[in-house]
Amino acid sequence: HIAHHTLPCKCPICGKPFAPWLLQGHIRTHTGESPSVCQHCNRAFA
């Protein structure tokens, strides 16, 4: 529980704390951005 309070990065949208390597993926939950797109059907995936 204490580790949750000492995480160094906070989401600029909702303020939740995250480790640096998880923050970018979390921000995608707010923006709807998907990093990968299928070349065959153009469907986006995380």
From Swiss-Prot:
**Subcellular localization:** Nucleus
Q: What GO MF terms are annotated?
A: DNA-binding transcription factor activity, RNA polymerase II-specific; RNA polymerase II cis-regulatory region sequence-specific DNA binding; zinc ion binding
Q: Name one GO cellular component term.
A: nucleus
Endpoints of the signal sequence: none
Q: Which UniProt keywords apply?
A: DNA-binding, Metal-binding, Nucleus, Repeat, Zinc, Zinc-finger
Q: Does the keyword Repeat apply?
A: yes
ZnF C2H2-type: positions? 1-4, 9-30, 36-46
Q: List membrane-spanning regions.
A: none
UniProt keyword annotation of Zinc present: yes
Query: Gene3D superfamilies, per this entry?
Result: Classic Zinc Finger (3.30.160.60)
Report the SUPFAM superfamilies cross-referenced here: beta-beta-alpha zinc fingers
Member of which family?
Belongs to the snail C2H2-type zinc-finger protein family.
What's the name of the protein?
A: Escargot/snail protein homolog
Species annotation? Lithobius forficatus (Centipede)
